[in-house]
Amino acid sequence: KERMITLSYKINSQPQTNDSYNTYLDIEPDENKLDIIKELSLKNFHSDGKTNTMEQTFQVDYTTPIGKLHTIETGAKYIFRRNSSDNRFYEAEGASENYAYNENRSSEYRHLNHILSAYAGYTLKYKGFTFKPGLRYEQTIQEVKYLVGPGENFDSNFSDLVPSVSLGIKLGKTQNLRGGYNMRIWRPGIWNLNPYFDNQNPMFINQGNPNLKSEKSHSFDLSYSSFTSKFNINLSLRHSFNNNGIERISRLITDKDGEIFEGGHKAPYGALYSTYGNIGKSRETGLNFYLNWNASPKTRIY
């Protein structure tokens, strides 16, 4: 093997537009009958939206052998992601077509993501034994700005170490034993993080949690395989767990005088207040067995 360095760049853009109308019609416009549109204060509305996601990725990878048994891998990646949304909402009185711009129901925001990561890996191969540990570091910086509509500007930073390790052993010419561990992370979305106190309906209040951490899932796997002219056998065991899943938390305001939140926001007595927290826990275990028997040159049983 020889030393190798790889440089790569990728750009991706996904613009979308949406233009929709919602119109109410009175199918029985008899003057003597109930005008349902006026009775229920229904309004025609028009929504004109534009969204775009643009992502650029810069990456460098380097691999070098050390002697006949060892290999070192290292690299770095930078991702710049820009999400923009501009949704304009127009309302008309009753069933008319005289639409007027409603800023309170419109929204426009910019979401910038800077993701920096670096990794290092080592591989040892000796006869039938393979050992491969690795470690990746990720730093994520988010900036969210609301230009129109309800929302609160905020920044968030995440720092994560992501380890992995794998082992492989050849048990003779036709048998293999493998095991490993890896971690996966999920970062909270802007709606989970946004600290805006949404009390448009004062009895159902929603607020994000800017103190959320990345959700981490740990997985362990062990597998055995054997291949002969008559039988192919594969047995695998997998276990994964998560101790800090992002879940919705809701509670009733039980204080007769209501409750005051950070920023001076007040939730009245009896309101349902909802936010998010790293409170989720999950466990999953799976066992898989596969057998392929070549009973005869023309018969194969799975």
Which sequence ranges carry the predicted segments?
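Surface-exposed extracellular loop regions of Gram-negative outer-membrane beta-barrel proteins
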Residues: 141-143, 173-218, 239-269, 274
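Outer membrane beta-barrel strand-and-loop segments of large Gram-negative receptors
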Residues: 46, 55-59, 100-106, 213, ...
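Face-selective signature of the C-terminal outer-membrane beta-barrel domain
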Residues: 1-145, 235, 283-302
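Membrane-embedded beta-strands of outer-membrane beta-barrel proteins
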Residues: 58-60, 118-120, 163-165, 210, ...
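Extracytoplasmic loops and strand-loop junctions of Gram-negative outer membrane beta-barrel proteins
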Residues: 37-46, 99-106, 115, 145-151, ...
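Outer-membrane beta-barrel strand-turn architecture
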Residues: 64-68, 123-128, 161, 169-173, ...
